[in-house]
């Protein structure tokens, strides 16, 4: 089992009719279905390249969206080299948010970045795969350190290392977490300044849209539009607990 996180962007072309809430629109260039973090990022990067982008989002408050519930972690500790390199790109982009996403309305964008690193721990059943992943980390210059389970509590005295075979850690400000809602707001604001248009509406069928390029950024709701695409919801749970002692330097930790 890989520790890689995967998201899917689906690109389609169609010449069919587009209707939204009984209001006909003609889309000349790019339509993005879904205005969450992937949709906003797609709008930003394509608008930056001069594309005419329209984003359709059924809930502009994002009350039921996935991204506001995220821990907002950014990392390069993946198995696949492509994901490692994307993680490195993400880190550099996040560090440049004040410059890249600055707008007239939001001259000081931020995502409240915390660079405490990532600490990922593995039991014996997953250790061998992680050793292989470390080879990819090394090739991609990810800056990942390997820590034996027996040494873990010496570095992190608050961790019970029982059952831990190995762990990987970064302490070079290359990993950490951000506020996903603030990041989304900055991306969306910049995309709009670059010419992207965000429209409230719900797409029931791809055939409703007429555009040169359609991008599905519907996340776990993709299957409602594209039944043949193997994207299914996967439930993750975050528990918030009160620690007896606040540990300011604690990394984002996964077991």
Q: What spans do the regions from the language model cover?
A:
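Core beta-strand elements of the Rossmann-like FAD/NAD(P) dinucleotide-binding domain
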Residues: 28, 207-213
């Amino acid at each position: 089992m890989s520790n890689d996180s995967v998201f899917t962007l689906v690109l389609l072309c169609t010449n069919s009719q587009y209707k939204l809430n009984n209001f006909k629109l003609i889309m000349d260039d790019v339509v993005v279905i879904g205005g969450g973090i992937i949709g906003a990022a797609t709008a930003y990067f394509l608008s930056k390249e001069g594309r005419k982008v329209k984003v359709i989002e059924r809930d502009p408050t994002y009350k039921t969206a996935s991204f506001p519930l995220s821990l907002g972690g950014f990392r390069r500790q993946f198995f696949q080299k492509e994901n490692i390199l994307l993680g490195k790109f993400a880190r550099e982009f996040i560090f440049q948010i004040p410059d890249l996403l600055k707008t007239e309305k939001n001259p000081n964008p931020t995502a409240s970045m915390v660079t405490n690193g990532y600490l990922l721990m593995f039991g014996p059943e997953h250790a061998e795969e992680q050793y292989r992943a470390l080879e990819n980390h090394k090739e991609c210059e990810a800056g990942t350190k390997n820590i034996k389970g027996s040494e873990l509590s010496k570095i992190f005295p608050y961790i019970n290392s029982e059952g831990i075979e190995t762990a990987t850690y970064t302490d070079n400000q290359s990993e950490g977490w951000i506020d996903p809602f603030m990041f989304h707001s900055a991306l969306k604001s910049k995309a709009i300044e670059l010419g992207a248009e965000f429209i409230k509406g719900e797409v029931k069928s791809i055939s409703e849209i007429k555009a040169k390029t359609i991008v599905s950024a519907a996340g776990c709701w993709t299957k409602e539009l594209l039944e043949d695409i193997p994207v299914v919801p996967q439930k993750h749970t975050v528990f918030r607990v009160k620690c007896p002692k606040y540990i300011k330097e604690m990394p984002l930790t996964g077991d």
